[in-house]
Amino acid sequence: MNPLLSFCNVSFGYEDRDVIRSASFDLQAGSCTALIGPNGAGKTTLLRLAAGILQCRSGNVILNNESLYKFAIRDVARMVALVPQQLDIPFQFTVREVVEQGRTPYLGFLRGPLREDRMAVDRALELADVTELQQRVFNELSGGERQRVKIALGLAQQPRLLLLDEPTQNLDIGRQIELIDLLHFLHSEGITIFASIHDLQLVNGNFSSALLLSPDMPLMSGTPEEILRPSLLEKAFNCPPQRHPLLLERTQRSEKRAG
């Protein structure tokens, strides 16, 4: 089966500094993949490359068996949606008005929203469980509510691939669990999920595959169990196992098996 998205020896940098170096990996259709790595490793940059917002310096990004750069921006946005960390809305837009912006790739120069656009917005609100918030002002919502609305905005694009940039950041544990449950549900609906995750303890058991991005080592891909090995994480995060509960727990488990 051909991957939905592939990075083929992709490099990208700002001015004279490379952020992504010779990155290669595949995202299979229907997969649920976590992207982990230390701050400043380039996770946001990698997601923006996957969404076609940035263009790689060398290599290629393949989307649905074609070079992503052969597609018009509108066509990429119909297949891939990026949920950013921050969404700044300068006006007092309602939740519904924000989510309606996700239909932009489908609107023509002289064509306003059609019935199918309204239905897509209704469905996105429903999937993200924010239908009851649709008449609320976006800027007056809590952090957890805003996160769900941002996901609804992405879903209104009706993408095959949903990219999320640290969706659980700044959420308390209850809200984190709710959001992970939402990602599980969207995955069950056939949407391919690719999310950068700050809390490593959310990765195992919630994602089918994982990528590890670090400035000090090549991009690593595998199952969560393979990627969350203490030896890899210690090198990637420059953190001794005894200083992080997840690393300590996994190191102790490995020692017990060895004994």
Task: Label each PLM-derived region with a short phrase.
Residues L162-E166:
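Catalytic Walker B motif of ABC-type/P-loop ATPase nucleotide-binding domains
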Residues G59-S67, V76:
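Conserved ABC transporter NBD signature motif
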Residues A51:
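Helix-to-loop junction immediately C-terminal to a conserved catalytic motif
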Residues S231-G259:
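ABC ATPase nucleotide-binding domains
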Residues E100, R115-L133:
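Conserved ABC ATPase "signature" region
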Residues I36-P38:
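The feature captures the beta-strand-to-loop junction immediately N-terminal to the Walker
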Residues V137-L141:
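Conserved ABC ATPase signature
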